[in-house]
């Protein structure tokens, strides 16, 4: 973090589920806007074909910048709550010092290092407290565990998604999505991704990108060209008329979400 993230606008994506997909969406939105972000993602976004890059301006094929030594100020990182090392039991994400942080969701996980849910909540509380007051927390407004974490103390502005009093979606025919902030219509997203979880991921990415300077309309346009991540509802073929998908979901709630 000292060598790569220092003096950069870090956008960190945390949560039990959806980190990889949301990080990929966010990196793609910024890249589509010509901001050429660096990123470190726990999967391979098909828009990039790689899981990490430093983020020099020419990394973006649509960038108009000409200085080949100029580094993008933006860096998107998948922010995991797993411990840092055997000699540092703090969660990895406390080292990233983000200016923009997404809190996708929170439930018990990593039973090998956390005794219970409250132990994970404590780490998320530490994470929330390092985000500056000129930053932004983008939080899932439907998650009671995240609400409990934020109630412990937070001095950063918060924008919620998934609730009528914040950012939310309405599904229309042909897999199109109307996007709203409160009751104000923001635009319509036409895309091929399925599921409520991906709509929530998209909202989080749009809000975070907006904080970094990308208008919502531009973010929606970018997501229309988003190709998802390998092994995230990846279509592998058809057998006897049945479409076969490959997905990385590994715990009960994630598997349930994918099946739904």
Residue ranges: model-predicted function:
Residues 1, 19, 83, 109, ...:
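Glycine-rich nucleotide phosphate-binding loop and flanking beta-alpha elements
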Residues 1-45:
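Walker A (P-loop) phosphate-binding motif
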Residues 5-8, 27, 32-35, 47-49, ...:
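Acidic, Mg2+-coordinating active-site environments of NTP-dependent enzymes
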Residues 12, 39, 76, 137-138, ...:
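Short catalytic-loop micro-motif centered on adjacent basic/acidic residues
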Residues 74-84, 244-250:
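Switch II (G3) loop of P-loop NTPases
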Residues 86-89, 112-114:
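Conserved ATPase-coupling elements of RecA-like P-loop NTPase cores
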Residues 248-260:
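AMP-binding/adenylate-forming catalytic core of the ANL superfamily
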